[in-house]
Amino acid sequence: MSAAKVSKKRKAVTKDVEEEAGVFSGDELNVGDIDGALSDDANDLSSDEEDSEVELVDDFSSDEDEDEEEELDSDEIPSDGEAPLKKKSGTSAADLEVPTNDDESSSEEEQPNFRIEKDANGNDRYIYDEINPDDNSDYSDVEENANTIGNIPLSFYDQYPHIGYDINGKKIMRPATGEALDALLDSIEIPKGFTGLTDPSTGKPLELSQDELELLRKVQMNEIPEEGYNPYEPLMEWFSNKQEIMPLSAAPEPKRRFVPSKHEAKRVMKIVKAIREGRILPYKPPSEEKEEDLELINYDLWADEAERPDHPMHVPAPKLPPPGYEESYHPPPEYLPDNKERKAWQEADPEDREREYLPTDFGSLRKVPGYGEFVKEKFERCLDLYLAPRVRRSKLNIDPESLLPKLPSPEELKPFPSVCATVFRGHKGRVRSLAVDPTGVWLATGGDDGTVRVWELLTGRQLYSVKVGEEDPVNVVRWRPSKDAVVLAAAAGDDIYLIVPPILDPELEQASLDLLDAGWGYAASKPAPKASEEGKKTTPPQWVRPSAALADNGVCAVIPLRYVAKSISWHRRGDYFVTVCPGSSTPASMAIAIHTLSKHLTQYPFSRRIKGGGPPQTAHFHPSKPILFVANQRTVRAYDLSRQLLVKIIQPGARWISSFDIHPTSSTASGGDNLIVGSYDRRLLWHDLELSQRPYKTLRYHRKAIRAVKFHPSGRYPLFADASDDGSLQIFHGSVTGDMLSNASIVPLKVLKGHKITGELGVMDLDWHPREAWCVSAGADGTCRLWM
């Protein structure tokens, strides 16, 4: 039992009872009984043992003991940790001896924390040791010179030399105040924990301890002040971590939950009976009062509010223009002025400046200062709003789609080529040129391997092949447009080869050979050139017969041009064809040559270089007029051969023209006055010569250079196409009418992709079937493709 309980038991008033023989008197008190009554082990006893112990203590107490205990103070009673006192019979309280424990294993907590002294009256006085608080104690150490005046302002002690009292009642003298020099030194050499405040209880400078500084640092850094506290301890689910199966939570379902309730059935039957009798109505119409209440609740304050119309003379204020790149705090470098521009802006008058500020690069937004002209700009804005007159401009509400031309659907414009039907393989290297014969049966190709090959168009079977260039590629091949004789012209190196393939029927082959042989007689009757003219470079070349090997393979004539020809174009009658040598080393007078098949004659129509636009690139005859179109790098010129005059100069605006073609229909239907131009700068241009010298339409659908453009040769299908280095062909619908009030209609139809890009080159050339809506393309991948 605790000491407090012992004291209560000793001071309790007990009734006098007679001593029995088995009860000990107070003088015969045993030490073991007292030890059991005062030690802490009594807490482990049961309630029955405590009751018996109280009875023993009451029996052991005597009248003399009660008187002595009444004289004891509460602070003289031993604490729970004190050892029991031994009392002998006939001894007083002064004779009590403090028992000592000789056992070395006893701890310091079991030693008594008091000593017994005599007071002034001679009574025993218990003097306790000072409490040494630990970390778990509510007590704290008191400083020796701590001021104990409490919550009293120090101004009460202004007239006294002291400022309070310590715990022993001694005066605490006022601390000495430093002079100005000391204050200056203190401000320079700031000690650790310095706050600049004065402690109201001591009058000394208030300094914080290391623990207080650490606490302030943690609070400032938003850290947890308490040491060792972990805010992210693992969650301990006290109520759900262990599933306890017991009748409270996992009891079996009662039977009443599966059996219909009889009481509910009775109540439902009462309601059904009342509904049948009419005492309960399933739907009760709301009363008028409730409807009025609902109307009042749902009243809309602005239900009848009408929008206030603007004044007839009201004109809204114009909005400020949105800021541009030059107003950014980190503008692009091209918007930043250099030193010259900055100096010119600073020297100019404010009225003459283009803008009120100079673009400045601050690097980051936090470095941007305040705008100095902010107030001035707002003031001028206010002046403009109420002083400047306003003008209302009517805005036209135009549908953007109405501005676009209404193009028909591609499905309505069929037929046009859309799929690859045949692939022609056999050339080694790039296929530079191809051509479909006027009958539409054969396809002629020429490539880097120096061979000219003739294929069957529908099947892709090779029928004829001849090698005309040992090291030079075949740059261009073209069929004679007439059907009475079949002649194939091929340019390889510096020569032009006229070939009659041995794949024709005998009659057609003989007619073709007779056409070429007729020219030999005219050339023989022509006077021979003089010796002085033979050395000139401008002397037209003489047609020669081929070698025996070439003659056996169908080559009938050779024209030595002395320069590489890149373009061949036949006249519609089949008796003339023009060649162009665009090389930079070619003389201007020999770049363009016109050849007569029936006379074996070559002429140079231009004695001087064409002005402007660079060397010539390609040339074509007009389909119905005696006009020759010659294209150089930048312009297309039309020459009247009968009058020998320059008719027109067409300016496509391209950097480098690669090819062009003339509309095949007659001039009476305005077809011959339209042409298309392809350029190496990825543009396809449509020209209406009656409209302007400039392009009517510019189409930019390719990512790389355009190599060839071509109209469909018959007027039956209004189709044209272009071939590009991006490996694709673009098919267009271009209808031309004779109405002078209507323009040409151009509709993109299909993008054909199949050739592989080899060496940055894609599709090199293309041609149309003379009767069908088919086209054939030659690629740098060594193949040709028929598109249907």
UniProtKB/Swiss-Prot annotation:
Residues 1-12 have a biased composition (Basic residues). It comes from the Eukaryota. Residues 1-125, 308-354 are annotated as: Disordered. PROSITE patterns: WD_REPEATS_1, WD_REPEATS_2, WD_REPEATS_REGION. SMART domains: BOP1NT, WD40. Residues 318-335 have a biased composition (Pro residues). Pfam families: BOP1NT, WD40. Keywords: Nucleus, Repeat, Ribosome biogenesis, rRNA processing, WD repeat. It is found in: Nucleus, Nucleolus; Nucleus, Nucleoplasm. One of its GO terms (cellular component) is PeBoW complex. InterPro entries: BOP1/Erb1, BOP1_N_dom, WD40/YVTN_repeat-like_dom_sf, WD40_repeat_CS, WD40_repeat_dom_sf, WD40_rpt. GO terms for biological process: maturation of 5.8S rRNA from tricistronic rRNA transcript (SSU-rRNA, 5.8S rRNA, LSU-rRNA); maturation of LSU-rRNA from tricistronic rRNA transcript (SSU-rRNA, 5.8S rRNA, LSU-rRNA). GO terms for molecular function: large ribosomal subunit rRNA binding; ribonucleoprotein complex binding. WD repeats lie at residues 426-465, 469-509, 611-649, 652-697, 701-742, 758-788. The keyword NADP does not apply. Residues 115-125, 337-354 have a biased composition (Basic and acidic residues). Component of the NOP7 complex, which is required for maturation of the 25S and 5.8S ribosomal RNAs and formation of the 60S ribosome. Component of the NOP7 complex, composed of erb1, nop7 and ytm1. The complex is held together by erb1, which interacts with nop7 via its N-terminal domain and with ytm1 via a high-affinity interaction between the seven-bladed beta-propeller domains of the 2 proteins. The NOP7 complex associates with the 66S pre-ribosome. Belongs to the WD repeat BOP1/ERB1 family. HAMAP family: BOP1 (MF_03027). PANTHER family: RIBOSOME BIOGENESIS PROTEIN BOP1, RIBOSOME BIOGENESIS PROTEIN BOP1 BLOCK OF PROLIFERATION 1 PROTEIN. This is Ribosome biogenesis protein erb1. The lineage of its organism: Eukaryota, Fungi, Dikarya, Ascomycota, Pezizomycotina.
